[in-house]
Amino acid sequence: MIQLEQRIFAFDRLGDFLRNINPEDPTYDHLFDTIDRAKSNNGWFSKDNVLHAFSAWGQLLNKKELIQWTLPYSFNHSAPKTIGLVLAGNIPLVGFHDVLSVLISGNKALVKCSSSDPLLIAFLIQKLQEFEPALVSFVEFTKERFTHFDAVIATGSNNAARYFEYYFSKVPNLIRSNRNGVAILDGNETKEQLEALALDIVQYFGLGCRSTSKVFVPKGYDLNLIFG
């Protein structure tokens, strides 16, 4: 059994790796090769967007944040559970939080990656296991239907969600379907806030389930504040 402190340390080391990405450092050759292959597999995964996703995770995966996040929970399992993960792939690394949640809680992840993002999460898990080899037995990737699992987290379209709800009905499950992000403006937003909203709209080409796709404004609102 890997102790929580070991798991946190492994993810902290992964975060440190992501915080220090340097194209001139041979240590990162594999990372940049993976980015190139991910772009070839999915044209929406531009180098800038993938690097942004890596950077965001680099900021989150630090010892202080991980300790604060896990502090309210007790992870005293008699034995790890196997959690099936059907991951989305609409934006780079969108499914990594599910993998993190399963592993940080001391459970095993049975991972089915989206065909849109089959490379990036596998790369991060490989690096994580280099930092903590004991985690090798805690992650299994598959392209087949799940056959041995205790619970499932599955993400997909509304149609896929209906299938998931039927297929996984006999085990504890968390099913996610389509989501849309909206912004509600009152007219008092600063220039910096509007610039941040613009980023929420266009980052990852607007393909994220939390990408802002609709904006509500007061009657008579000066749209030049947005488009100007």
Task: Report each predicted region and the residues it spans.
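Hydrophobic packing residues within well-ordered alpha-helices of enzyme cores
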Residues: I121-L124, F164, I226
